Amino acid sequence: VVAEQDRPQSTVINWREHPNVVSDEEIIEMVHFAQSLGLKVILKPMVNVSDGTWRAHINFFDTDVPCEPKWSEWFASYNEFILHYAKLAEETECSIFVVGCEMVNADRREKEWRDLINEVRKLYSGLVTYNCDKYQEDILKWWDAVDVISSSGYYPIDKWEQELDRIESVVNEHNKPFFFCEAGCPSWEGGDLLPNDWTLRGKADVNVQKEWYEKMFSTTVKRDWVKGFALWDWKAHLY
């Protein structure tokens, strides 16, 4: 479920009656359909910025300044958004609920995230995770607050082993399950070296994508602590 805020420093998240946000009825229908097929469902509310800025750049001063937007204002709106979908996740018996995705600058607001997770647990009885961005697994300070560690697995094809070594140390430290809540590679030349950069364009090459996925799966299958993947949807209209 993707909501939007107007700019990186906006403090209001537009999710009620927004034309780009799917309705609760649509979510319920799709969750029940997936479950009827025997699938387990992860509900993942996300925030995008309407002007195209990546959500990792949502940021405010650490110390409140008069007449400037504040973290407290942003989290008030974000919490309302997340708690609505936590309740929906409980009602539809989703297996995992994701409290946030790739909010790199917001990650440092440890107290706000811990408080939010505590409120989520009052509404939702399933597994709770946070989807940190690539390279942030060993930087996030509040993994103890969630049930499952998850991250975005957009690593260069020749770096998988060393990145898995780094992530493994985090998993061992916290003794929690781990999965890639996002992972993928676009099917264009050069995509295997910068799979996270959706702004790049190159000649279409499905073998680039195929070899990247083969590398990801062949390296992670040897790591029994990697419990699974949620694969990103690369849309054909990009070409």
Regions found by a protein language model. Name each.
Residues 16-25, 65-78, 199-211:
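A short acidic, glycine-rich active-site loop
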Residues 11-17, 190-239:
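Aromatic-rich peripheral "rim/lid" segments of glycoside hydrolase catalytic domains that contact
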Residues 82-101, 132-161, 176-177, 181-196:
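Aromatic- and acid-rich polysaccharide-binding/catalytic face
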Residues 28-40, 90, 113-125, 168-175:
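Surface-exposed amphipathic alpha-helices with a cationic face
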Residues 6, 18-22, 75-79, 104-110, ...:
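Acidic-and-aromatic substrate-binding clefts and catalytic sites of carbohydrate-active enzymes
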Residues 1-12, 25-106, 190, 234-237:
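Substrate-binding cleft and catalytic face of glycoside hydrolase catalytic domains
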Residues 23-27, 78, 82, 113, ...:
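Aromatic/hydrophobic pocket-lining residues that form the small-molecule binding cavity
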Residues 42-47, 96-108, 114-138, 175-183, ...:
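Aromatic-lined carbohydrate-recognition surfaces of secreted/lumenal glycan-active proteins
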